[in-house]
Regions:
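Expand to "…catalyze enediolate/carbanion chemistry for C-C bond making/breaking, isomerization
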Residues: 1-164
Length: 164
């Protein structure tokens, strides 16, 4: 629990540090609870860790999912941490690899939207326009880095065919 409370200090402790990871087992032991499979017992720690990591500009990785017979629960857990902004998931079994890759690899829909956002922001910025819509969604400069990150992840995953 102390590590979670000191997450920002840990993230800023060294320029050589590139990321942090949550240990669900240690955390639940400290809180005198147990891992349930729902992830509720880890939610506060996960939020604190990802906020600290982002504030410090480092990556954040989630804890292992220990119930190897519950692949549906594992999938839900990975979807949750992906939506929270984690960079990855620690795994303990080869059967878990494909699910993590599937969830963390941008879809073609994600890629197409990200390309539109990047191109539109570049064009609108040159015209002095700060807020506009893409596919009916309000967009401003705050969305630029996320769109670029989607494209970079697509490139790293080998699924990007675009020209950005």
């Amino acid at each position: 629990a102390r590590g979670v409370m000191k997450a920002l200090d840990i993230c800023e402790a060294s320029e050589r540090l590139f990321g942090i990871a949550l240990s669900g087992g240690d955390y639940t032991k400290d809180l005198q609870t147990h891992i349930t499979g729902t992830g509720l017992e880890l939610m506060g720690a996960r939020q604190n860790m990802i906020i600290a990591a982002r504030a410090a500009g480092v990556q954040c990785f989630d804890t292992v999912y220990t119930n190897l017979d519950d692949m549906e629960g594992f999938r839900h857990d990975v979807e949750t941490i992906h939506l929270m902004g984690f960079d990855g998931k620690s795994i303990i079994n080869p059967r878990q690899i494909n699910i993590v890759h599937e969830i963390f690899t941008p879809t073609q829909k994600d890629i197409i939207f990200a390309e539109k956002v990047v191109k539109e922001i570049d064009e609108k910025k040159a015209q002095g326009i700060g807020v506009f819509t893409v596919d009916g969604k309000m967009i401003d400069i705050a969305f630029y880095d996320g769109a670029k990150r989607t494209i970079e992840l697509a490139k790293a995953s080998g699924v990007y065919k675009g020209d950005l």
